[in-house]
Design a protein with these regions (language model features):
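Conserved acetyl-CoA-binding loop-helix of GNAT-fold acetyltransferases
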Residues: 88, 93, 99-112, 124
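A conserved beta-turn-beta hairpin within the catalytic core of GNAT-like acetyltransferases
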Residues: 73-88, 98
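Active-site rim helix/loop that mediates acceptor-substrate recognition in acyltransferases
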Residues: 20, 27-69, 74
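Conserved glycine-rich acetyl-CoA-binding loop
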Residues: 63, 81, 94-105, 117, ...
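A short beta-loop-alpha structural element at the N-terminal edge
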Residues: 7-19
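Conserved active-site alpha-helix within GNAT-family acetyltransferase domains
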Residues: 116-119, 126-150
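Acidic/histidine-enriched, glycine/proline-rich intrinsically disordered or flexible terminal extensions
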Residues: 164-208
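Internal, conserved structured core segments that host functional sites
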Residues: 54, 58, 89-92, 119-125
Length: 208
């Protein structure tokens, strides 16, 4: 995709380090002191659930300003079925370009590509004020419960195929790849040490 000075394209191996650094800058001290998202991204590239066809970067005038990855996931239905869907994230925008519409533009483009690949629905945890603008609704209104918090208003879902979730009642668990930092904290710390030092701060509004 190219619009004005913006290009959205697939990530290449040559982008890896720059994308990891962008992700680190985007999430640093946002949800917790420091961040983990850049390591999650780093590890997911070798995970079978990773969708390389939906691994996008965004450039503005040749400068890398955004990234998003997609991951295969599923709904565990109450009737025993497992319904394949997808999730995405991390999705990050460089701090200097946040709140200017680039994140939504990247998200909407990538969701259209996910739809073209046959994804029937996307499930995420996030802010309805942002994701609602791209068609997401609380998943519990569609019969899908978040395993960690069944009544969560922040667990969101969007049908990419109309009617895909009709008749479905079930539970969604975050894919295991999102827990690499907790499972191997030493490897995460070693990875973090390869980046420039940044101060970890405890700030109001963080989740942990």
């Amino acid at each position: 995709m190219s619009e004005k000075n913006i290009i959205i394209r697939l990530e290449t191996k040559d982008d890896y380090r720059a994308v990891e650094n962008l992700t680190r800058e985007s999430f640093w001290n946002v949800y917790r002191p420091g961040c983990m998202e850049h390591y999650v991204l780093h590890c997911y590239r070798d995970d079978p659930a990773f969708v390389p066809e939906l691994d996008f970067v965004m450039e503005l005038d040749g400068e890398l300003i955004g990234q998003v990855i997609y991951v295969r996931s599923e709904i565990d239905c109450d009737d025993g079925r497992k319904v394949p869907i997808m999730t995405f994230g991390p999705i990050g925008i460089a701090p200097a370009y946040k709140r200017q519409g680039y994140g939504k533009q990247l998200l909407d483009y990538s969701m259209e590509k996910a739809k073209e690949m046959g994804a029937g629905a996307l499930a995420i945890t996030g802010n309805i004020d942002f994701y609602g603008k791209s068609g997401f609704v609380p998943a519990k209104t569609k019969g899908v419960r978040y395993a960690d918090d069944p009544e969560a208003d922040y667990f969101l879902i969007r049908e990419l195929t109309p009617g895909f979730l009709d008749g479905i009642s079930g539970t969604y668990k975050d894919p295991e790849g999102y827990f690499v930092c907790e499972k191997n904290p030493e490897a995460f710390e070693q990875f973090e040490e390869t980046f420039p030092k940044k101060e970890k701060l405890k700030l109001l509004g963080q989740l942990c």
